[in-house]
């Protein structure tokens, strides 16, 4: 408790209900810790991707979160990926967000269906941005710059000049365009799986990622529909 009144002096133990990002952070961190104990052969970024892609955006009755507007499998502008779903997170990722290089030292089974919906959505967004900015060279969009700063006092250079804003936008556009072009040139808009390590990975889901599967070490097992979609006549 905060030291707000005589009944609740500072340091008195008790329970209370809080909301917002301050309380969301420890819950997400706790979920991440549980998943890291489940996937001990993965690095933190890989476990984070499982946390993201297996999150849910529905209430206990199956209804969507209030205000949820994104398509299934795509982060929402308000909620992001949603709420961690540890039950689903136990069974592998639900999407590949790029090249997933997994060094398996033991046995792991992924039974979730694995797609690349978020990657597909990002590709559409990036293509639209490249077109709107002429591949990052057109920085003439409106600059919403104020003439005065009304926040904290004694802040130097609080008002950004048009010249600085143009310079920063040009640098940002250039870097973003280069990053997008690199994804295009190297096929990074398709999720792929690379199996390393002496262990065994078993895939049992109906998987629709399009970047393929590479087995470098150990063993890899799965159904016909578990290795993603490739550009063959049969789609396998």
Describe the residue ranges of each PLM region.
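Residues on the solvent-exposed faces and adjacent turns
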Residues: 106, 111, 118, 128, ...
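Gly/Ser-rich catalytic serine loop of serine hydrolases
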Residues: 14-28, 188-192, 205-213
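Extracellular S/T/G-rich loop segment that most often corresponds to the catalytic His/Ser-adjacent loop
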Residues: 1-33, 37
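C-terminal subdomain of the subtilisin-like protease fold in secreted/lumenal serine endopeptidases
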Residues: 14, 37-157, 173
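Surface-exposed loop/turn positions within long extracellular repeat scaffolds
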Residues: 185-190, 202-236
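Signature of short aromatic-glycine-proline-rich micro-motifs recurring in repeat-based ectodomains
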Residues: 81-84, 189-194
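Intrinsically disordered, low-complexity acidic Ser/Thr-rich regulatory segments
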Residues: 160-191, 198
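Residue-level detector of buried hydrophobic side-chain packing
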Residues: 20-22, 31, 51, 80, ...
